[in-house]
From Swiss-Prot:
It comes from the Bacteria. The keyword DNA damage applies. The lineage of its organism: Bacteria, Pseudomonadati, Pseudomonadota, Betaproteobacteria, Burkholderiales. One of its GO terms (biological process) is DNA recombination. It holds the Pfam family RuvA_C. Residues 65-143 are annotated as: Domain II. Coiled coil: none annotated. GO terms for cellular component: cytoplasm; Holliday junction helicase complex; Holliday junction resolvase complex. The gene is ruvA. This is Holliday junction branch migration complex subunit RuvA.
């Protein structure tokens, strides 16, 4: 299995890339979140990859972070969710936003993504519950949330609060707040109910 590609970015045409690695050109599909962070063509690029082997094709999907790749892997395990829909989900929202939507059971946020209807959104919420939120801080190169916010979230989960309660409490903590102060503010928000 190909887990990582490092080479020269030859072409980029959303969502497709062509990366030259020692004279071999790899065609890779990426979510838009990764696409927007790519260097200019001709520059060096490093992507974490997921290879999918089908009867009629060998496909490579690339990601800028380990969190995106792991979320993609979780998504394609769900019945009825293929790589195309998984890429659409990761293009439509960040890993942190997806984890929050799952934690808060917000099907409406998922139905805004092209290709996701109400039933698919509900299946995603059901299948991903408990698989994303608690792991946010443990994935190297994780989502675009501060380490302090992840530490506060993990502290609340360790104290026995549910994913949903912890996520709602985190919303009450201003960005840039330290861990200890963040925990105090989150606990205060939880005590108010």
């Amino acid at each position: 299995m190909i887990g990582r590609i490092a080479g020269t970015l030859i072409e980029k045409n959303p969502p497709h890339l062509l990366v030259d690695c020692h004279g071999v050109g790899y065609e890779i599909d990426v979510p838009m979140s990764t696409f927007y962070n790519l260097p200019a063509t001709g520059e060096k690029v490093v992507l974490l990859t997921q290879q999918i082997v089908r009867e009629d094709a060998h496909l490579l999907y690339g990601f800028g972070t380990a969190a995106e790749r792991e979320t993609f892997r979780q998504l394609i395990k769900i019945s009825g969710i293929g790589a195309r829909i998984a890429l659409a989900v990761l293009s439509g929202m960040s890993v942190a936003e997806l984890a929050q939507a799952v934690t808060l059971q917000e099907a409406g946020r998922l139905t805004r993504i092209p290709g996701i209807g109400k039933k698919t959104a509900e299946r995603l919420l059901l299948e991903l519950k408990g698989k994303l939120g608690a792991d946010l801080g443990t994935v190297p190169g994780g989502p675009a949330v501060s380490d302090d916010a992840v530490d506060v979230l993990n502290a609340l989960l360790a104290l026995g609060y549910s994913d949903k309660e912890a996520a709602l409490a985190i919303k009450q903590v201003p960005a840039g707040t330290g861990v200890s102060e963040g925990i105090k503010l989150a606990l205060k928000a939880l005590s108010k109910g």
